[in-house]
Every structure is written in C-alpha cells, then in structure tokens.
Amino acid sequence: VSSLPSTGRTLAEWTAASRSDFAAAAESLRALRENLDTGSNAWISRIPAKRLEEEIRRLQKLPPSLPLYGVPFAVKDNFDAAGWPTTAGCPGFAYHPTISAPAVARLEAAGAILVGKTNLDQFATGLAGTRSPYGAVVNPFDRAYVAGGSSAGSAVAVAEGLVPLALGTDAAGSGRIPAGFNNVVGLKTTRGRCSKQGVVPACPSLDCIAVFALTADDAGVALDVIEGYDPEDPWSRSDPTTDSAPSIPKSLAIPQSTEWFGDNRAELAWLGTMARMEDMGMALHAVDFTPLFELASLLYHGPWVAERHAALGGFIEARPEAVDPVVRTIIARGREFSASDVFEARQRRQELLCEVRALFARHDALLVPTAPSHPLLSAIAGEPLEQDSRLG
C-alpha cells in the first residue's frame, strides 16, 4: 500500500485561518493552487493564477462572518460554473456557461472559492472513476485500486487534503461509493432538496447533489448552504424532508446476507463495523433486503436507462466517436425499452417502496456496506460492466 494521503484542514480550520490572518490565508490559497496536481487525475481544470487573485480580492470585500469564508472547494465537472468550461467528462460535449449552477453560486456567496473542477466517469455513467478521456482517477491510498465513481475526482480531492469540500452527483451510488473508497464523508442529499439547475443530467428523476467532506459536521454545514427550493428546477421540491431518525439511532437494520465477491477485506471491515455499532449500544437486526436489491436491479437493468438516453441520446447519436465505448453501450440500451416497460417498472417500484417504508418504520436507520468489494483497476479494465454492476 502506498503512503496515506495527509488529512487536510476542516471547514472550521480554513475559516478560522482566513478570519484571523487574511494575508497568510491568501498565501495558503496560492500554495494550494501550485500543488493541486498530485498525479491522481482528479482534476479536469484548475484555477489560473490570475483568477485566484480576483477571487482573493472578492473575498476581502465579503464579511468574515460568512459560514465558508475563505474555504477552497471543488465541483464535479458536470456542474456549471461561470467562466469555467463544463465537459461532463467529454471534450466534444464541452460548453462555456455564463451562469453558475445554484449550488456553486450559493457556496461562493457563502465565502467559498472554487479552485477546480474534478474528473468523473463520462456523463456520470460508471461507479469506478475510470471512464474518462482525462485519465482514470487513481485511489490515493493504493493506486492499484479504483477511486470509485462517478464523482471520483471530488472524493479524491478531499481525501488528499487539497480541499475540505467538494460537490458531486449521486443517482445510484456516484457520491457514496467514491467517498467510501477514499475514507471521506459522502452525503447524498434528499431528492429535490438542492437545485440541480446547471448540472448536466444523467438520470434526472433520480439525480441528487452529493457533498464530500472530511467530517459529517462539515457536510452538514455545506448542505445548510446549498439546500433550498428552486422554482426554476422542475425537480425541486419545496419540502422534501421526511421524518428524521433519532440523532443517536438505537435500532439498525442490516442485510441478512451479503455477497462479497471474494473480497475478504471488505467482509472483515463490515464485521468490524457491526462490532463497533454494538459496542456503542446499538441493536442490529438482520432483515431481508430483497425489496432493496430488486429496486437496485430495476435501476441498473430496467428502463431507467432510457432516461439517460432521453437526456443524452441526441448528442451520443450525433457524435458517437466522442463518447467512451462503454458509456455509449450502456446509454444506447435505453432504446430497447418500450413505454409499457417504463410504466410497468414504475408500478413495481411503487410496490417495492411500500415494503421499504415498512422496513424503515420498524428501525431507526439502515446500516449497509458502501460496496461489497473494492476492485482493482485491472479488474475494471477486464470486466467493466460486470464490475460496475457489482458495485451498484
């Protein structure tokens, strides 16, 4: 295993430094810019020196009491940021927005400074972080292993201690899996809670913004900044919250059985996690997760892939040579489903949700492994679709 990445500053440490000694904090930002490229392929674009100086001057005019005053952050390169190209991991798709996505704009208004846009599985289609013409994102703990995707670069940028905060997206694991593989917090926000305006869609009805941070508290601070109803986002909801679990859950549902695909380290980590939860006084209840597994199968193998085709099929059919072959194959499958297939799947989803709600009613929270295994880069190269389906 390679040397472990150093832990960076938390949000509180960055804001405290910026408030107490602005000149020194500005020098820290300049030094950060010089050291962003660690060879991990985490970045697609990084802030130029001239723009950083403009951002430092902007920061000087803002009140130091802002919650993210002086905090550097990154965003997955499917978010629009004014003055930055948006590629979604596909150079042929790239465009230059003049307006930032609301999530980006809210972070900047809270005093944060965007220092770069991060690498991803092209069009957020993948769970390994390898389907990118900008290079496969490598895991900073061991470069033989995948970083996880699709928000690979955002997770790695936080794991390497470069930024304390990064945004990604998550429809089916794209925020949580790279967080788990890189030892950082990954928060998938509630569907509709944060505006997705200015974010390249993958599966619009399921896409959610994801937050990467070093601590759960930091992820919560960021969520407080970016959440809110957006009347211009057709998927935004004015009150998307549900009843909250207790702050310290007592009853946790765990899967009755888990397939580890021969990854003994993943199994040992899971056993250790369960033991720690029990040591903390939590009761673990083995539950039949069949409804959840069927939901996952519907998402990955059912007609929801047609939604990806609806969002991106026009570009892919016009510019097939610009698209990663595996991504092209996955999204092209969306043409195979009929309208009847879609409505049948929607009905089945609602039936399964009734079973899932009953599960939640009996327990405070679910405790599950982030992924059943952590594949090598070589395994993904040999079996890209099979390995991806295991992660999902």
Regions found by a protein language model. Name each.
Residues 2-5, 68-91, 249-253, 303-353, ...:
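Short helix-loop capping/hinge segments that flank enzyme active sites or metal/cofactor-binding pockets
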